[in-house]
Design a protein with these regions (language model features):
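Feature captures the catalytic cores and cofactor-binding loops of soluble hydro-lyases/lyases
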Residues: 1-2, 6-111
């Protein structure tokens, strides 16, 4: 079981190109989470996109103590699934209703 504050995006996340692996900040100016830090959060997003090398970004986030406490998405792609497995970050797959009911800033427990 894992608890934390929801940081929710309605856009897919490219971990390789959009996340600072040292700070956990979203660096893509076009992303709806631009400037937010994901460290310690329950990161809620539709799915991951981009290079499979993004899995190593997720691992680096964990190594730098900048990773989310858990990730929750509607569809687990290979990058997110393998990154979470490498970094030992809980990954939850949400139904459309569960995803819609998650609000940015909510305190939630999953698991």
């Amino acid at each position: 079981k894992v608890s934390g504050k929801v940081v929710k995006s309605n856009q897919p996340i490219n971990f390789l190109g959009s996340v600072d692996k040292k700070t956990g900040a979203i660096t893509d100016q076009k992303h709806d989470l631009f400037g937010k830090k994901i460290a310690g959060s329950i990161l809620v997003f539709p799915n991951g996109v981009g290079s499979s090398v993004g899995a190593y970004t997720i691992y680096s986030l964990k190594s730098n103590n900048s990773a989310p406490a858990a990730m929750a998405c509607q569809k687990a792609d290979l990058t997110v699934a393998s990154g979470c497995a490498l970094a030992n970050i809980p990954l939850f797959i949400l139904s459309p209703d569960e995803y819609d009911n998650m609000k940015d800033g909510d305190e939630v427990s999953l698991g």
